[in-house]
Curated annotation (Swiss-Prot):
EC numbers, comma separated: 1.97.1.14
Protein name: Selenate reductase subunit C
UniProt subunit comment: The complex is composed of three subunits: SrdA, SrdB and SrdC.
InterPro entries, per the entry: Electron_transfer_protein, NrfD-like
Species in which this protein is naturally found: Mesobacillus selenatarsenatis (strain DSM 18680 / JCM 14380 / FERM P-15431 / SF-1)
GO CC aspect terms: plasma membrane
Membrane topology summary: Multi-pass membrane protein
PANTHER family: PROTEIN NRFD
Chief localization: membrane
Keyword Isomerase attributed: no
Name of the coding gene: srdC
Signal peptide span: none
Record keywords, A-Z: Cell membrane, Membrane, Oxidoreductase, Transmembrane, Transmembrane helix
């Protein structure tokens, strides 16, 4: 009953999203609240949010498949699948933000070697192929087994994903295939580390090289993006594993490991944030300092103090500290960060547009499209929520057809011997 209600609600949200996207594509950018001065809005916020979730989740998966940290083995599949679907969501958001989304292929045909954006597109394609290939090597045995043991749509879906692979009859051949899969996953994971760093670090670089926006124009910006990605990825894994991944009610060692990782990443992110704000507030140039004042004390002060400081830093650390490994509190800590990171992404994008480049520019013209103010309208919210609903619906359907959540440890061997464990101590 609950499952039926869940899919009904998701389907309704997805339909609303499809309608909103049709309006966006048919009417163009005029349906948004964007202005000539505030040209990036809610869609870009969600774009960097989901790209960060993807990069963070993938980098966590490398702990299992590259660095042999077997205590994280139970989230290996989950990390790869969330990396893939988060990437899809991020690319869809940036696609609808384009003035002419039908021209997206121009970036592939008309390359500009000196353009960060051009290189970023190549990284996205390579990154996507690496994730898909790693998932296939990880899951090909299960795809083949489920293609034989299931019926209907599940059977067809899994048989298609096998790409013709069949499970060997002999145990010796099966072990050889598993060793080969492990070998290829390690190779792909190693290649994926610089690619994932390039994907989200490159996204940060797109902001960091914009000289006209002093708030972004810094060598620290790509680093902030990367650390924030690790925070969001660890938080998403903690949330999903706590509530859906078969975690024990109390004392699950993986929960404690994820909690320790999340706390570590939050600490690094906090250090970078303090450095950024201290330097920014010390700036003697008024219009450059104005952005930081707006974040801290402006009309939307609560996005920073409640969203970033409260939900991303104070609340999760408090919950992890008092949880003593309890599944509910650890899951809520992860959820708090996952939701709060949206506020972090908002703060990264929107405040950069509040300060005119020179005095009087904000009042020189009288037009709703020439304002240094931005608030997403109803269609922007409905298209965003609907698009998220579409991606979550696709992910949920995949979970029904493919065993994404591991209830038991996966079997991976290196030359027939167990891989050594590496532990993170709190």
């Amino acid at each position: 009953m609950l499952k039926k209600l869940y899919f009904t609600v998701l389907s309704f949200i997805a339909i609303v999203g499809v309608i909103s996207l049709y309006i966006r594509l048919s009417e163009g950018m005029k349906m948004s609240a964007l202005t000539s001065y505030s040209s990036w809005g809610l869609w870009i916020v969600f774009y960097i949010y989901f790209i960060g979730l993807s990069a963070g989740s993938f980098l966590l998966s490398t702990m299992v498949y590259v660095f042999n940290m077997k205590q994280f083995e139970r989230i290996g599949k989950l990390a790869l699948f969330t990396a893939f679907f988060s990437l899809m969501a991020g690319l869809l958001f940036v696609l609808i933000d384009l003035g002419h989304p039908e021209r997206f292929w121009h970036t592939l045909v008309y390359r500009q070697p000196n353009s960060i954006l051009s290189w970023e597109i190549q990284f996205y394609l390579i990154y996507m192929l690496l994730i898909v290939a790693e998932i296939w090597f990880l899951m090909r045995e299960e795809f083949a087994q489920r293609a034989q043991s299931t019926k209907g749509l599940t059977k067809l879906f899994n048989r298609t994903l096998t790409l013709g692979y069949k499970v060997p009859n002999s145990q010796q051949k099966l072990e050889f295939h598993r060793e080969q899969s492990h070998k290829w996953m390690k190779i792909l994971g190693i290649a994926g580390i610089p690619t994932a760093v390039g994907v989200h670090g490159g996204t940060g670089s797109l902001f960091g090289v914009v000289m006209a926006k002093e708030y972004w124009f810094s060598g620290l910006t790509p680093i902030i993006f990367l650390v924030s990605a690790l925070v969001s990825g660890a938080a998403l894994m903690l949330f999903l594993y706590s509530f859906f991944g078969g975690a024990k009610k109390n004392g699950d060692s993986l929960l404690k490991e994820l909690g320790t990782l999340l706390t570590l990443f939050i600490g690094i992110d906090l250090l970078l944030m303090i450095a950024e704000f201290l330097i920014g507030l010390y700036n003697p140039i008024h219009h450059e300092r104005m952005t930081f004042n707006e974040i801290l004390f402006g009309d939307r002060w609560f996005i920073f103090w409640i969203g970033q400081i409260g939900m991303v830093i104070i609340l999760p650390i408090l919950l992890i500290t008092i949880s003593k490994g309890k599944r509910l509190l650890m899951g809520l800590a992860g959820l708090s960060v996952v939701l709060g990171i949206v506020c972090v992404r908002w703060i990264l994008v929107i405040p950069a547009y509040v300060a005119p480049h020179f005095d009087g520019l904000d009042s020189a013209y009288n037009s709703s499209r020439l304002l240094y103010e931005y608030s997403p309208n109803l269609l922007e919210w409905s298209s965003s929520v609907g698009l998220i609903g579409i991606v979550i619906l696709l992910f949920s359907i995949t979970v029904q057809l493919v065993p994404v959540f591991n209830k038991q440890k996966e079997v991976h061997q290196t030359h027939g011997k167990p891989t050594p464990e590496i532990h993170i101590k709190a």
